[in-house]
Amino acid sequence: MKIDYIIVGLGLAGIALVEELTRRNRSFLVFEDESQSSSLVAGGMYNPVVLKRFNPVWKGAEQLQEALPHYKRLEEKFNATYDRKMDILRIFKSIEEQNNWFSACDKPRLKSFLQPTIEDNPYAEVKAEFRMGRVKGTGRVDVRELVSDYRDYLEGQGLLIRESFSYDDLELNDEEPQSQLKYKGHKAQRIVFCEGNGVSENPYFNWLPLEGTKGELITIYAPELS
């Protein structure tokens, strides 16, 4: 089987790559064993503002310009809802934070995301003595549902193989880098690894000085909080 690309891994990065290759009429085959779960455990929250000190996320606006239409196309493709848009309310801890908020609202890269008002606390159960500020253009992507739907979709088309990728079975021609590579009877022009943190086990890239990062997701039970 001759194809343009072999893709290893199908999380958010792999899905984005597959969508781009499809638009460019390139052929591909994906290998995915679900051993890397970064996308599946991700909270899926997108927010272009660093709320600790009210600074813009690096290229946050530019990233949203690419990401939001991408997720919209996926929703249309599967007749599903993955992008759940919701504002963020930032609780102020002091008068100084309120003043810093207004200063941030005047910054060109933040003014479209920060509402230039102070809001009353609508929740009696939440302690917010110095009130709140509203961040717009934020939301949460249901990553687990999206990845599951996309894997089933590719598998149904015969474009996804659910098995671990064996690096030892990959044949490269070092003398002719532009020639086809081979893998278990498949021939491809290129291979792209979308393994996330799994790249640390990849013999071609495990020399890179990468360090995994972790976040925290706190689930609370508050039945009386509307």
Name each model-derived stretch.
Residues 165-186:
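Conserved beta-strand-loop-beta-strand element in the redox core of flavoprotein oxidoreductases
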Residues 13, 36, 198:
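Conserved Rossmann-like nucleotide-cofactor binding loop
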Residues 73, 77-161, 168-173:
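Flavin (FAD/FMN) cofactor-binding and adjacent substrate-gating region
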Residues 20-23, 33-86, 99:
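Conserved FAD-binding subdomain of flavin-dependent enzymes
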Residues 3-29:
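N-terminal Rossmann-like FAD-binding beta1-loop-alpha1 element of flavoenzymes
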Residues 181-226:
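Central helical "cap/lid" subdomain
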Residues 9, 32, 92:
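Short beta-strand/turn micro-motifs composed of small residues
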Residues 17, 40, 100-101, 172, ...:
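Short glycine-/acidic-enriched loop or helix-start segments at secondary-structure transitions
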